[in-house]
């Protein structure tokens, strides 16, 4: 399969690329930084994202999956200390990049025999704490957009789903804090396994809870 992974230079992206590549798929890693062999694309530039979609189609003829793993977090101790510039940043990272990739890749996913799209969301979207106001609002907006995208895919073989975590953990975090147990966190390798499992289900417009 031909699978695009955005945010591919981050811990979750690296785990997804590693898993999907090991399974024999052609994975196109995309990241703003261009680090670790990824394609350097600014996902806040809609025209650049449209060009990415056109380039993928020209080179591979199709796309079987788009896994959007661009993330970010900003928070505060109290609601009153919330910084609106943090809210704006999170809107850019979590919502605008999502809007651009779904609008650009929708035709390719619809044309695929089994196209899959997914984002990672957080429990904070459904039950935000006061210090997570900006983050929870951005995640909730991203979920709403993804569910609308899922509705647009109804009647086609393609699906769009939301993978829900409390938070993610990776080996670097464990090495930095060997005494922490990270209760309720989802390992990025387990997330990668869940991503690969999307092609084994026809579920569409579903919030898949990885915390249970």
Task: Kindly label every feature range from the protein language model.
Residues 50, 71-88, 131-134:
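Conserved mid-core segment of classical short-chain dehydrogenase/reductases
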Residues 62-64, 109-123, 155-159, 203-206:
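Active-site loop of short-chain dehydrogenase/reductase
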Residues 155-158, 162-163, 170, 179-212:
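C-terminal helical subdomain
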Residues 32-47:
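Rossmann-fold cofactor-recognition segment
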Residues 17, 54-58, 93-113, 150-151:
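Amphipathic alpha-helical dimer-interface segment in Rossmann-like NAD(P)H-dependent oxidoreductases
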Residues 80-100, 117-118, 142:
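Catalytic Tyr-X3-Lys loop
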Residues 9-18:
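N-terminal Rossmann NAD(P)H-binding glycine-rich loop of SDR-like oxidoreductase domains
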Residues 90, 110, 116-154, 167:
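Catalytic loop of short-chain dehydrogenase/reductase
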């Amino acid at each position: 399969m031909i699978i695009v992974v955005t945010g591919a230079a981050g811990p979750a992206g690296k785990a997804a690329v590693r898993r999907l590549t090991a399974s024999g798929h052609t994975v196109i890693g995309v990241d703003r930084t261009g680090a670790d062999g990824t394609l350097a694309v600014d996902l806040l530039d809609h025209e650049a994202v449209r060009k990415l979609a056109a380039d993928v189609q020209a080179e591979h003829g199709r796309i079987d999956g788009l896994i959007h793993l661009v993330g970010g977090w900003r928070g505060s101790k109290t609601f009153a200390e919330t910084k609106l510039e943090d809210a704006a940043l999170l809107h850019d990272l979590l919502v605008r990049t999502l809007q651009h990739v779904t609008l650009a890749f929708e035709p390719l996913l619809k044309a695929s025999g089994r196209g899959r799209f997914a984002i990672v969301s957080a429990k904070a979207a459904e039950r935000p704490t006061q210090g997570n106001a900006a983050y929870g609002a951005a995640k909730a907006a991203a979920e709403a957009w993804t569910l609308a995208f899922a509705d647009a895919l109804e009647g086609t073989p393609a699906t769009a789903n939301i993978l829900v975590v409390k938070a993610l953990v990776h080996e670097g975090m464990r090495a930095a804090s060997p005494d922490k147990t990270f209760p309720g966190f989802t390992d990025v390798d387990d997330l990668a396994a869940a991503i690969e499992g999307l092609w084994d289900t026809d579920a569409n417009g579903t919030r898949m809870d990885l915390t249970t």
